């Protein structure tokens, strides 16, 4: 169904069955397949391809050459009806590629709200990206990667499959990330190594001094105490009782399976 207020350029191909929402704009030479849904106010500028079972929310901006919901590159894929889901107010710049999920990986590639994907960024099958993340130019995520809120991935960086990146992490340009990255950490390198807390980013997001102090102390426990994670976990749990921001560490470690960067 195409809403009466939607605008579709004569050169665009919108297959019968596609859902185009109120005030959405489908620009020149775009292709929207029959199982796709484009939400209210979303703009596809030109030469955008939306394939498969793909749901794109409201007020997104998708620039020329972007490919959304394409068949993934997992050799086990056998044409299963997997999906791509994108939330609201995302900016997806030129030549970004976002692939559909796999049956082995939960069936869906999922992107939240208010994210920015810069030129040539790649999101592979089954990635789970939360809200307000930034992938800079040519940043690439392998399959099953998880990015929590407010993650920044520097240009030309690559993240190994199944890696979890915690909230408010900043990865410097050219980083190769093969293990999980705890919340609030700054890291860079090949392979990526931690080099402190993302203090400036946290200040910009309104974290107060006591909270920053607690996060720094937890970072020191993890990386500078000379003890194992199991040994310092009781102290982290104690901090979490008085500083809710520290609970992000506990949630992260409960999900982590690849070990953390060192």
UniProtKB/Swiss-Prot annotation:
* Catalytic reaction(s) noted: a (3R)-hydroxyacyl-[ACP] + UDP-N-acetyl-alpha-D-glucosamine = a UDP-3-O-[(3R)-3-hydroxyacyl]-N-acetyl-alpha-D-glucosamine + holo-[ACP]
- Name-wise, this protein is Acyl-[acyl-carrier-protein]--UDP-N-acetylglucosamine O-acyltransferase
Family membership noted in the UniProt record:
Belongs to the transferase hexapeptide repeat family. LpxA subfamily.
Species the sequence originates in: Actinobacillus succinogenes (strain ATCC 55618 / DSM 22257 / CCUG 43843 / 130Z)
- SUPFAM superfamilies referenced in this protein's UniProt entry, alphabetically: Trimeric LpxA-like enzymes (SSF51161)
- Subcellular location as annotated: Cytoplasm
Q: What Gene Ontology cellular component terms go with this record?
A: cytoplasm; membrane
Q: Which PROSITE patterns match?
A: HEXAPEP_TRANSFERASES
């Amino acid at each position: 169904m195409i809403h009466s207020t939607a605008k579709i350029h004569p050169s665009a191909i919108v297959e019968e069955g596609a859902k185009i929402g109120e005030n959405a704009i489908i620009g020149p030479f775009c292709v929207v397949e029959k199982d796709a849904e484009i939400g209210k106010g979303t703009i596809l500028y030109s030469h955008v391809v939306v394939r498969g079972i793909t749901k794109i929310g409201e007020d997104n901006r998708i620039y020329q050459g972007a490919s959304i919901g394409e068949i993934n590159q997992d050799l086990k894929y056998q044409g299963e009806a997997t999906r791509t889901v994108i939330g609201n107010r995302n900016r997806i710049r030129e030549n970004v590629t976002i692939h559909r999920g796999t049956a082995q990986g939960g069936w869906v590639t999922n992107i939240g709200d208010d994210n920015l994907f810069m030129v040539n960024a790649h999101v592979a099958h089954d990635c789970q990206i939360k809200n307000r993340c930034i992938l800079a130019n040519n940043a690439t995520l392998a399959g099953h990667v998880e990015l929590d809120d407010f993650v920044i991935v520097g240009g030309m960086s690559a993240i190994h499959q199944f890696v979890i990146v915690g909230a408010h992490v900043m990865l410097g340009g050219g980083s190769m990330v093969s293990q999980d990255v705890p919340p609030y950490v700054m890291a860079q390198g090949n392979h990526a190594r931690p080099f402190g807390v993302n203090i400036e980013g946290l200040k910009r997001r309104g974290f107060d001094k006591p909270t920053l102090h607690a996060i720094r102390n937890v970072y020191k426990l993890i990386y500078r105490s000379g003890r194992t994670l199991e040994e310092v976990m009781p102290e982290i749990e104690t901090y979490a009782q008085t500083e809710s921001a520290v609970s992000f560490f506990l949630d992260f470690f409960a999900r982590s399976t690849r070990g953390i960067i060192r």
